[in-house]
């Protein structure tokens, strides 16, 4: 399966929701603001929008520390707002690309909270853990450090970028 033909010539407009149009006066851009500006974006010659992370997050890293991939961050709106954005964009012949963060989650994600428990459970292996509390993961290319001493589980967990972003285990097949 190759690249879709529409992707060869599309022009995307990248949107960081927080700094886009604020429609409710709280000082933070939101999905309704993006919906209001779809005609403007289309008039610029853009055929799609690339939406930076918009999911529930504690926002230690601008939303790249996702706590719930199934819920829009309340500061940006609701899941219904996101559905409306897709609908309105598609009505205008525009594509919507969501910025997915597949390498890590937030330490506040439910998977990670369960993974931190000393008792083995279905989430134990979803993150990159070692039983060696002093492991620095230098032999793993994309790992930038580790976090330790914060849970009932022995050892430490690898992180991507910041200490609030535990690395997901790509070797976990489920």
Spell out what each predicted region is.
Residues 2-173:
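Acidic/aromatic-lined carbohydrate-recognition and catalytic surfaces
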């Amino acid at each position: 399966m190759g690249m879709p033909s529409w992707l060869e010539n599309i022009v995307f407009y990248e949107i960081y929701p927080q700094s886009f149009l604020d429609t409710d006066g709280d000082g933070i851009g939101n999905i309704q603001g993006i919906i209001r500006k779809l005609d403007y974006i289309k008039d610029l010659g853009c055929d799609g929008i690339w939406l930076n992370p918009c999911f529930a997050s504690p926002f230690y890293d601008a939303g790249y520390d996702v706590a719930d991939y199934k819920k829009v961050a309340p500061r940006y709106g609701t899941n219904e707002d996101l559905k409306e954005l897709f609908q309105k964009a598609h009505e205008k012949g525009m594509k919507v690309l969501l910025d997915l963060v597949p390498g890590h989650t937030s330490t506040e994600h439910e998977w990670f909270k369960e993974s931190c428990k000393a008792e083995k459970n279905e989430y134990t292996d979803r993150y990159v853990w070692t039983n060696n509390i002093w492991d620095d993961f230098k032999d793993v290319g994309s790992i930038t450090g580790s976090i330790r001493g914060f849970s009932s589980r022995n050892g430490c967990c690898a992180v991507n970028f910041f200490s609030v972003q535990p690395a997901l285990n790509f070797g976990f097949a489920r």
